Amino acid sequence: MFGTIIRHVVGSRNDRLIKKARAIVAQVNALEDRFKAMDDATLAAQTAIFRERLARGEPLDALLPEAFAVVREVSRRVMGMRQYDVQIIGGFMLHEGKIAEMRTGEGKTLVATLPAYLNALQGKGVHVVTVNDYLASRDAEWVGKIHRFLGLSVGTIISDLSSEERRAAYAADITYGTNNEFGFDYLRDNMAFSPADRVQRGLHYAIIDEVDSILIDEARTPLIISGPTEENTDLYYRVDKLVGSFVVDEDYTVDEKARQVMLTEEGIEKAERLMAESGLLVDGDLYDLANVTLVHHLNQALRAHVIYRRETDYIVRDGEVCIVDEFTGRMMSGRRWSDGLHQAVEAKEGVAVQNENQTLASITFQNYFRMYEKLSGMTGTADTEAFELNQIYGLEVVIIPTHRPVCRTDFADLIYRTSQEKWKAIVEDIRGCQQRGQPVLVGTTSIEHNEFLSHLLKQARISHEVLNAKQHQREAEIIAQAGTPGAVTIATNMAGRGTDIVLGGNVGHQVDMVLANPDLEEEEKTRRIESLKSGWQGLHDAAIAAGGLHIIGTERHESRRIDNQLRGRSGRQGDPGTTRFYLSLDDPLMRIFGSDRLSGLMQKLGMKEGEAIEHPWVTKSIENAQRKVESRNFDIRKQLLEYDDVANEQRRIIYQQRNAFMDADDVSAEIRALRDDVLDAVLAATAPEGVMEERWDLPGLEAALDRIFGLQVPVGQWLEQDKGLTHAALRERIMEMVLSAYAAKESLMGSEMTRHFEKSILLQVLDSQWKDHLASMDHLREGIHLRGYAQKNPKQEYKRESLIMFNAMLDQLREEVVSTLSRLHVSPAPAEPLDWDAIARAAQPRHLQFSHPDFAAAAAPLVEDAGLALTGLGVIGEQEAGHSPAISDDKVGRNQPCPCGSGKKYKHCHGRLQ
């Protein structure tokens, strides 16, 4: 109560921030006439003046009023659009590193031009992040006109660009692109083998459009670059055949909240019997340690059949299983579920099962975007997630006032007993809207419901448009015309987000289509455009007279924010509009959160078929259920971040060290340090200083020196011959032999080849060890929760063991680099002139896959297939002099002996470097 009184007297934190911003707006407005009086050339020259002032040491904030006023004037001249005062406030909040919550239709795209221009003056680059390629290309072309007028360069990062095109786009002053592309380019840069192959520069300032979608909805799914592993896919088909006979509640139980399936005792016995009969379970019980793989496959097959539904969670297209994003309804081409789940779904659908992939590099959006020096974002719905955005990213949410008052009416939810009654009521509501000429947007939660409603409307002979993952290409066109009188549009959740629904239709989009039609003469184009423009006002007025855009929600989402996004499509810029959610007791949210009590109440009230409950109390109870889910999801994301922070710190160390190696022309000093560390480790393990010689493991020491350095070192003989040989003298004598042998090889290879070779081996072994470490970390994380049963803190155990694994990886890295370099011998065949860049590119991993929501169709490999990285160097393994084997990784099996002559399996020798 006391806090309420204080807020009433001094205003809320949001009110105080808006008041501060209004003072900036007053300064910008005072400069308007000054810049209006300038001609185009003088106005464009302001950029050079601003940069000169920055170079003299003037702070960036001092330029803000003038820079914003310049952008506003250029926008008026180039775009015919002048930023409103509330848009100036939004731009100021973005510059301050905050999240601006702005209602749909308030012009967020135009707002971003203000801080983007101001911060680009520093010359460090500004990234404007959108959710898909279409919006990135559209914004770069549309508002990019403002920046280009002012002499700034604008780049676009979308899928299917070459490295050269990406490098040029990142070199621009302002770069528009998708969150996935920015993240994948960061990972690719940290897998490059030459500084020239990197495309990004520093992560200076990012403005994220639809920031809630990117930083919250997609935060739990990491960006992953992976490569194929060798695994028998037949097991997925064999296990899939067995689970079809399992019965729910008898053989297994389902936890819908956790999306998990658990076998009962009867189910375990049945699984053991069926697996034994099919030859899968050869020995022991199902849950014996030796059969853990079978348990894993069985669980994933059950989840594929019971939890994951076709047309809701995925669709099958062209013989492939494509995941459907639960938040947007879009296909997530190129993304695959991990841990064998995607393979289980493929087996269920009878399509080709593709091998699982091994992670080569990964990062979450949480950790990627926290690397930017300054971060800001904008969205129409962030206030419900303000606590999480502040806790995890340190971003404050500021609610920006609307330019015009919101005239939308949000009706209370209607709740029916069955889904059949609900769908019938929805169809009747749509029919009524179309008859009175009111445009309707219907939001569904899945493609299945989307197409089911379309089927009902066809039966009722109601014309409509369908927008889901299958109509992704027509998305902008369908949304653009969703505001015409009587239009009915069915869309999965947030499909079409980023494109405004204009009452009367988007005449600009229609004009663009006419201009792009090559079959029309110029005179016909002009006539049609004039007709469109003259007819639009009548359509606009008719749509308003009918009540504006009517939003129908077919069920509540787990998150209130997603529901608010749907509501927010109506009532843009002061237009009228209405919204209504239709629910049934069969809906997932209602079913999970206590629909039994509500069902009993409806029966006691004697409600007939087709009657609905409509009361604010019921709506409030549903919102309370949503808050519970949101709280649980926040806890999950926070916990995931705590685990990922451990890997993130290790990633930072590895990438920092890797970049230092790659930027250096000469890593010989680092190689010498590694050699010293390895020798010290060998001596500490076999002949530790301070321990009597009688207790030294001399055979082990000699074997280790032979294995690592390829040298026959007679340590025992030395000690026999020189009783006074100290530990330090012994180490010095061994090192002399090692350095002498290496110097002899270097004299044959030449200094230049040796330096290049050291760098190449160091980077390749580092990548190989990091890849294996990521897999080990995944395995550790999967089972770490079981430590809780032993009264141990899983997070602390994860941190402790991951550090042990990380240090062990570094030890293995040192030994493998030194061993590889020490055991190489120069071929007597003269080496031809070498193309080191081509050699470096050939060493990169091949057949990569990039996975995350909304990532465009399976990306092509980064490099063409090439021979083994070491081929052509004139370098071979230690072997008989004069014999140089032909090395071809395409013909050597991973478990066959390596042709270099080392005696190791190919996958543990040169194949490991791929």
Curated annotation (Swiss-Prot):
Q: Name one GO molecular function term.
A: ATP binding
Q: Where does ATP bind?
A: 87, 105-109, 500
Q: Name one Pfam family in it.
A: SecA_SW
Give cofactor(s), names only: Zn(2+)
Keyword Transferase among UniProt keywords:
no
The reply on keyword Lipoprotein is no
Q: Which GO terms describe its biological process?
A: intracellular protein transmembrane transport; protein import; protein targeting; protein transport by the Sec complex
Q: What is its EC number?
A: 7.4.2.8
- List where in the cell it is found: Cell inner membrane; Cytoplasm
Cellular component, GO, one term: plasma membrane
What is the protein's quaternary organization?
A: Monomer and homodimer. Part of the essential Sec protein translocation apparatus which comprises SecA, SecYEG and auxiliary proteins SecDF-YajC and YidC.
Protein task: Part of the Sec protein translocase complex. Interacts with the SecYEG preprotein conducting channel. Has a central role in coupling the hydrolysis of ATP to the transfer of proteins into and across the cell membrane, serving as an ATP-driven molecular motor driving the stepwise translocation of polypeptide chains across the membrane.
Name the NCBIfam families for this protein: PRK12904.1 (NF009538), secA (TIGR00963)
Which family is this protein grouped under? Belongs to the SecA family.
The protein's name in its UniProt record: Protein translocase subunit SecA
